């Protein structure tokens, strides 16, 4: 680490998923970065770690709280909150402890939290997956990565393929196409949901608009928006920021029934703060008035709030 830092490296990504299981080792690594930050506080530095969600010793907490905004990111794998599915895939996870740790990280540190859920696991249906998404939204991580299960060579998930009628794509990345509990159409809808969520939720561009879009039932409401956006555009890629902003305005006004001036003002403020180029049509109609190491998206989440406190 010292050699890489001395040669100019300022972005570090650790892919060891057991980083936080050995507190002494993890603490030493964190202290290494804290020392460099203290020595040159104006010199940008960014460190990314994978974190086991239900294990966060005090020794690590004491170091984590000392990191400034934009310097630390944790990738945290939840995959599923369904205890039966967890047992089936041999995933031992104390969900209550994981929730406590995620809430603590969100409320007491500047760490950027990137948390994942996986759709298509054996025995999990759309309702269960949606409940898991809602549970995660309530914990307010900066990003929720919605992924589709992939078949990896030699992975034990294969032993459940027959029992749950799991059908996978024949080409990489070998994503699941359907299971006995999640239809092919539902898998496709979740895949579109994931793409649109990345553009709207994970992008950090719409902190004022997102809470009104999600309301009291985040998964159901965003899935409805996702289905509507697909019917409107027929696209999941090459959607410019102004296209998304205009779609959000149309949804809020035409579907949700929100006052146009109110919806447009929030979306326009979000859009302007995000630094996106271009001007959505509703803004043109007049309906609404330096160096860093952290990636742009993380900076938006630090300076804004993806999921404001309720």
What are these model-derived regions, one by one?
Residues 5, 37, 41, 64, ...:
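Generic secondary-structure transition motif, activating predominantly at the C-termini of alpha-helices
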Residues 30-32, 132, 161-165:
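Short, hinge-like loop/turn segments at secondary-structure boundaries
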Residues 20-24, 78, 83-89, 119-127, ...:
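Flexible glycine/acidic-rich beta-alpha junction loops that bind and position SAM and/or redox cofactors
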Residues 1-122:
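Conserved SAM/AdoMet-binding glycine-rich loop
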Residues 192-310:
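Radical SAM enzyme core and accessory elements
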Residues 59-64, 122-140:
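Catalytic cores of alpha/beta
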Residues 98-101, 132, 190:
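Hydrophobic side chains in well-ordered alpha-helices
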């Amino acid at each position: 680490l010292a050699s890489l830092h001395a040669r100019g490296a300022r972005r570090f990504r650790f892919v060891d998923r057991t980083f936080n299981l050995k507190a002494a080792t993890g603490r030493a690594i964190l202290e290494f970065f804290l020392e460099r930050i203290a020595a040159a506080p104006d010199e940008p530095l960014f460190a990314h770690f994978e974190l086991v969600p239900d294990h966060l010793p005090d020794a690590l907490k004491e170091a984590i709280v000392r990191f400034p905004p934009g310097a630390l990111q944790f990738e945290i794998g939840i995959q599923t909150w369904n205890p039966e599915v967890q047992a089936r895939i041999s995933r031992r996870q104390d969900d209550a402890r994981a929730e406590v740790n995620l809430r603590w990280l969100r409320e007491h540190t500047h760490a950027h939290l990137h948390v994942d859920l996986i759709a298509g696991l054996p025995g999990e249906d759309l309702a269960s997956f949606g409940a898991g998404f809602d549970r995660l939204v309530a914990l307010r991580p900066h990003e929720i990565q919605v992924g589709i299960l992939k078949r990896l060579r030699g992975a034990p998930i294969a032993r459940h393929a027959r029992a749950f009628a799991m059908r996978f794509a024949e080409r990489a990345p070998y994503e699941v196409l359907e299971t006995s509990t999640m239809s092919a159409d539902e898998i496709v809808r979740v895949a579109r949901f994931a793409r649109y969520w990345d553009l709207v939720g994970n992008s950090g561009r719409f902190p004022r608009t997102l809470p009104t879009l999600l309301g009291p039932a985040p998964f159901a409401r965003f899935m409805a928006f996702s289905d509507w956006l697909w019917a409107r555009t027929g696209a999941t890629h090459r959607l410019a920021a102004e296209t998304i902003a205009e779609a959000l305005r149309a949804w809020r006004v035409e579907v949700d029934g929100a006052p146009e001036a109110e919806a447009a003002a929030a979306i326009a403020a979000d859009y302007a703060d995000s630094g996106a180029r271009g001007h959505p049509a509703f803004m043109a109609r007049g309906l609404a008035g330096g160096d860093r190491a952290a990636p742009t998206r993380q900076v938006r989440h630090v300076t804004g709030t993806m999921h404001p406190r309720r």
